């Protein structure tokens, strides 16, 4: 039902100079860049102040719910265990939350992958993700695509691993490796001008301190095993989670 006029209206409302940031990174002179931007964008007229309501965090379910979508042609079941989270980049436990998610399901070394892929052989990969934004309105997700016949077992194992990181302190070596992964990635990415531009934009969009990325590595390395456990309990739900499964009902239910 979207018409071309709707796109034009959207563009006119949101693509305005009082709703954008221009980030320039490189071997440049500030005065010259400012002059050039004024020359190229000076005729760009301001629009009306945007007063759209900020998104509001939806409450998680009172008790865990299972939502099943029957897809008769499916050869696999897609599983998502999810809950809403209130997490911002400037929250005190943000870096602990990053480490908790990485240890749970950030890659091949995560709890989920080692259990569902390496141990059980249910899937080619099992991962988790933890979102954040300036409004504190995002999601935690853990999931995998598995054979239809092992769907129930896979759900149980995913919940088991979420419970594990909530109840048990993570091994110090696992935390050390998770930190090293983030530190290495940060250093490599910092060599890319586009990444630096993204950092500058993040500081503005997320109301971060100007030295946020200068202390990034220090904040990562200061996370303790106890911090990880606290973050996992805060952001990874068990009793208030939604389990969504899309698969072939005749094989699963």
Predicted regions and their residues:
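Short amphipathic alpha-helices in soluble, non-transmembrane regions
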Residues: 34-41, 154-161, 253
């Amino acid at each position: 039902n979207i018409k071309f006029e709707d796109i034009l209206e959207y563009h006119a409302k949101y693509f305005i100079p009082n709703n954008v940031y221009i980030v320039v990174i490189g071997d440049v002179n500030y005065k010259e860049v400012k002059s050039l931007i004024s020359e190229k964008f000076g005729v760009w007229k301001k629009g009306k102040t945007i007063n759209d309501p900020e998104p509001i965090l939806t409450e998680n379910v009172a008790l865990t719910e299972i939502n099943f979508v029957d897809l008769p042609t499916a050869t696999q079941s897609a599983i998502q265990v999810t809950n809403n989270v209130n997490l911002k980049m400037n929250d005190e436990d943000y870096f602990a939350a990053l480490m908790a998610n990485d240890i749970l399901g950030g890659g091949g070394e995560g709890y989920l992958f080692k259990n569902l892929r390496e141990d059980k052989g249910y899937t080619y990969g099992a991962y988790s993700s933890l979102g954040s934004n300036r409004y504190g309105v995002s999601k935690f997700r853990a999931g995998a695509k598995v054979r239809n016949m092992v769907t129930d077992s896979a759900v149980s194992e995913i919940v088991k691993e979420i419970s594990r990181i909530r109840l048990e302190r993570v091994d110090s070596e696992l935390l050390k490796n998770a930190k090293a992964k983030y530190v290495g990635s940060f250093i490599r990415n910092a060599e890319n001008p586009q990444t630096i531009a993204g950092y500058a934009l993040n500081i503005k969009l997320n109301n971060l301190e100007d030295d946020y990325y200068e202390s990034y590595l220090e904040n990562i390395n200061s996370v303790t095993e106890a911090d990880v456990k606290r973050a996992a309990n805060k952001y990874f739900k068990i009793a208030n989670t939604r389990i969504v499964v899309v698969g072939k009902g005749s094989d699963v239910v």
